[in-house]
Curated annotation (Swiss-Prot):
The lineage of its organism: Bacteria, Pseudomonadati, Pseudomonadota, Alphaproteobacteria, Hyphomicrobiales. Its EC number is 2.7.7.6. It comes from the Bacteria. InterPro entries: DNA-dir_RNA_pol_insert, DNA-dir_RNA_pol_RpoA/D/Rpb3, DNA-dir_RpoA, RBP11-like, RNAP_asu_C, RNApol_insert_sf. This is DNA-directed RNA polymerase subunit alpha. The gene is rpoA.
Length: 337
């Protein structure tokens, strides 16, 4: 059946987020993944994170008394070119769509920082200590900024405004809230299989969004883009009611115990005790299992943990087990578990 193409691939059962000393850096560990999927997912998520998340940035600046970026300002130590470079590093968060205008005024002596800018609405300066310029005694500066929302990197020549007033200087804009993304793929173990992938993604942002949300947005973008390629309807699964009308027990009991990926010792003990199906296993009590030759407490805990993941436990009663046509039923319901 076609759904086996994706249903029988192993899916991650562990997603762990970890924080760093820098609150803008976070990591996520995902495991286990099918071999090769760590590289596939890591590279796709990295590219989307760096290119496609929206943010806010300054697109143009007007400095009183300045006509172009190759000017200098009396009493200001930095020239306009250096000031513009510093302006490009201002990190902003703005939930509403732009453009918006913000203003800053400063008298010397002193340092003009990003936190001195008067914001409007829901706008927030994320690096208020960032230095824009340094003013000497009796120096004064007034700047007006245009802030907009977008994605990716936009060069200054694309931020030019038609019929803009003289002195409005366009600025390169880095809208992306993501500063850096790296990933690492390692081998991990699932049951007796040792060559699954473990993906570790590390995301550094400017503070406008946390790493966990950024990953969620990137995954949603990929999901939306890939949906175009799905040219079929999801095959219908038999409902629980339909299954129960034909079976007097959970279809998962028809699964063979050698598919549970138990340790070699546990699997051999079950085999030696003629336990073939999960339905055979769950009717055993803990004391009965411990009386099995070479079967110890460690194997018991392993089996209890596996059964718990399936919503089952030892010592269950199934009056209609085993069914007469158990082999035929096992083949019929194999896609449901």
């Amino acid at each position: 059946m076609i759904q086996k193409n994706w249903q029988e691939l192993i899916k991650p059962n562990k997603v762990e987020f970890s924080k760093h000393d820098n609150p803008n850096i976070s990591s996520v560990i995902v495991e286990p993944l099918e071999r090769g999927f760590g590289l596939t997912l890591g590279n796709a998520l990295r590219r989307v994170l760096l290119s496609s998340l929206r943010g806010a940035a300054i697109t143009a600046v007007q400095i009183d008394g300045v006509l172009h970026e190759f000017s200098s300002i009396p009493g200001v130590r930095e020239d306009v070119t250096d000031i513009i470079l510093n302006i490009k590093e201002i990190a902003l968060r703005m939930r509403e769509e732009g453009p918006k205008r913000i203003v800053v005024c400063k008298e010397g002596p002193g340092v003009l920082r990003a936190g001195d800018i008067s914001t409007v609405g829901d706008m927030e300066i994320l690096n208020p200590d960032h230095v824009i310029c340094t003013l000497d005694e009796d120096a004064e500066i007034r700047m007006e900024f245009i802030v907009n929302t977008g994605k990716g990197y936009v060069p200054s020549d694309r931020n030019c405004i038609d019929d803009a007033r003289i002195g409005l200087i366009p600025v390169d804009s880095l809208y992306s809230p993501i500063r850096k993304v790296s990933y690492k793929v390692e081998n991990t173990r699932e049951g007796q299989v040792l060559d699954y992938d473990k993906l570790t993604l590390t995301v550094e942002t400017n503070g406008a969004v946390n790493g966990e949300d950024a990953l969620a947005f990137a995954a949603r973008i990929l999901q939306d883009q890939l949906a175009l390629f799905i040219n079929f309807k999801e095959p219908e699964k038999p409902t629980v009611e339909e299954s129960n009308s034909e079976l007097a027990f959970n279809p998962a009991l028809l699964k063979k115990v050698d598919e549970l990926e138990l340790s070699v010792r546990s699997a051999n003990c079950l085999k030696n005790d003629n336990i073939v199906y999960i339905g055979d296993l769950i009717q055993k009590t803990e004391s009965e299992m411990l009386r099995t030759p070479n079967f110890g407490r460690k194997s018991l805990n392993e089996i209890k943990e596996v059964l718990a993941c399936m919503g089952l436990h030892l010592g269950m009663e199934v009056p209609t087990w085993p069914p007469e046509n158990i082999d035929d039923l096992a083949k019929r319901y194999e896609d449901q578990y």
